[in-house]
């Protein structure tokens, strides 16, 4: 289970990173949440998988994020989305 609250500035940065990818590169960003029992740590682990797809449905990039703090996780996701945006900009 995620802990903490997401700072609104970080949430706005995340939304901006998604919007830039969609507008500049005509891609879709999908998020899938997951959770599982982690017997090694004797706890439940959870996280999210972010995937970037072309309009035709081809996977461009994907990454799994597992952080116990929501704010840390959204910052990591935002940084990754910005990196994907930069890589796509130079790839075209």
Curated annotation (Swiss-Prot):
GO biological process, one term: DNA replication
Pfam family, one: T7-like_gp12
InterPro entries on file: Phage_T7-like_1.2
Keywords annotated in UniProt: DNA replication, Early protein
Function: This is an inhibitor of the host (E.coli) dGTP triphosphohydrolase (dGTPase). It is implicated in DNA replication.
Protein name stated in the entry: Gene 1.2 protein
Record lineage: Viruses, Duplodnaviria, Heunggongvirae, Uroviricota, Caudoviricetes
Name of encoding gene: 1.2
């Amino acid at each position: 289970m995620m802990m903490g609250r997401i700072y609104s500035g970080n949430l706005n940065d995340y939304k901006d990173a998604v919007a830039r990818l969609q507008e500049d590169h005509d891609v879709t960003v999908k998020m899938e949440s997951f959770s599982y029992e982690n017997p090694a740590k004797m706890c439940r682990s959870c996280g999210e998988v972010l995937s970037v797809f072309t309009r035709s449905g081809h996977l461009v990039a994907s990454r799994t994020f597992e952080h116990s703090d929501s704010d840390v996780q959204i910052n990591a996701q935002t940084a990754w989305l910005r990196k994907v945006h930069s890589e796509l900009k130079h790839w075209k």
